[in-house]
Amino acid sequence: MTEAVSNFEAPPMSRRVFLNALLSSSVGVVVVGTLYPVVKYFIPPSSGGAGEGVIAQDALGKPISVSELLATHAATDRVLAQGLKGDPTYIVIDNGAVANYGLNAVCTHLGCVVPWNAGENLFKCPCHGSQYAANGKVIRGPAPRSLELVSATVDGDNVRFSPWQGPDFREA
């Protein structure tokens, strides 16, 4: 039986078959190399492990220090940070402490970033005039919904954002 296997010879590969295989492989590598960044662009960044969330970061990508934040901001301020999936998210300061919730800063009408207006104690969308209360509840349209809630917890000297669990307390 070993003699039958040892006498077997593979047919020689012709030059045409070799060049076709080489060309097909080269085209495949170029196509995969071109499509990879395109596909990666459409996949949102990870927001951390399930339930773990992400550490709030400033505009430069550095973690925000809670002690520094509370020392430099008013007792009822809203501070813009980088939150879940890289979305702009407000850290809510109530009575001089970080609240247990944060607010996604993206307007629910057309996706503009909504700035905090401390003088009027509300959020005003610069695109179409939607207004939100200090807790993110919509008070004037055309926005159809309140700003999205995220859970905010103090983790050492950092703020950790995670997806909001449970009912919306603003709808009571």
Swiss-Prot record:
Domain called Rieske: residue spans: 61-161
Membrane topology: Single-pass membrane protein
Residues the record lists as binding [2Fe-2S] cluster: C107, H109, C125, H128
Keywords in alphabetical order: 2Fe-2S, Disulfide bond, Electron transport, Iron, Iron-sulfur, Membrane, Metal-binding, Thylakoid, Translocase, Transmembrane, Transmembrane helix, Transport
Keyword Iron-sulfur: yes
Cofactor: [2Fe-2S] cluster
Subunit annotation: The 4 large subunits of the cytochrome b6-f complex are cytochrome b6, subunit IV (17 kDa polypeptide, PetD), cytochrome f and the Rieske protein, while the 4 small subunits are PetG, PetL, PetM and PetN. The complex functions as a dimer.
Gene that this polypeptide is encoded by: petC
Function as written in the Swiss-Prot or TrEMBL entry: Component of the cytochrome b6-f complex, which mediates electron transfer between photosystem II (PSII) and photosystem I (PSI), cyclic electron flow around PSI, and state transitions.
Disulfide bonds: C112-C127
Cofactor note: Binds 1 [2Fe-2S] cluster per subunit.
Annotated NCBIfam families: PRK13474.1 (NF010001)
A cellular-component GO term for this protein: plasma membrane-derived thylakoid membrane
Top-level taxon of the source organism: Bacteria
Transmembrane segments: 17-39
Protein name: Cytochrome b6-f complex iron-sulfur subunit
GO terms, molecular function: 2 iron, 2 sulfur cluster binding; electron transporter, transferring electrons within cytochrome b6/f complex of photosystem II activity; metal ion binding; monooxygenase activity; oxidoreductase activity, acting on paired donors, with incorporation or reduction of molecular oxygen; plastoquinol--plastocyanin reductase activity
Catalysed conversion reaction: 2 oxidized [plastocyanin] + a plastoquinol + 2 H(+)(in) = 2 reduced [plastocyanin] + a plastoquinone + 4 H(+)(out)
Other observations noted: The Rieske iron-sulfur protein is a high potential 2Fe-2S protein.
Family the UniProt entry places it in: Belongs to the Rieske iron-sulfur protein family.
Family matches, as InterPro entries: Cyt_b6_f_Rieske, Rieske_2Fe-2S, Rieske_2Fe-2S_sf, Rieske_Fe-S_prot, Rieske_Fe-S_prot_C
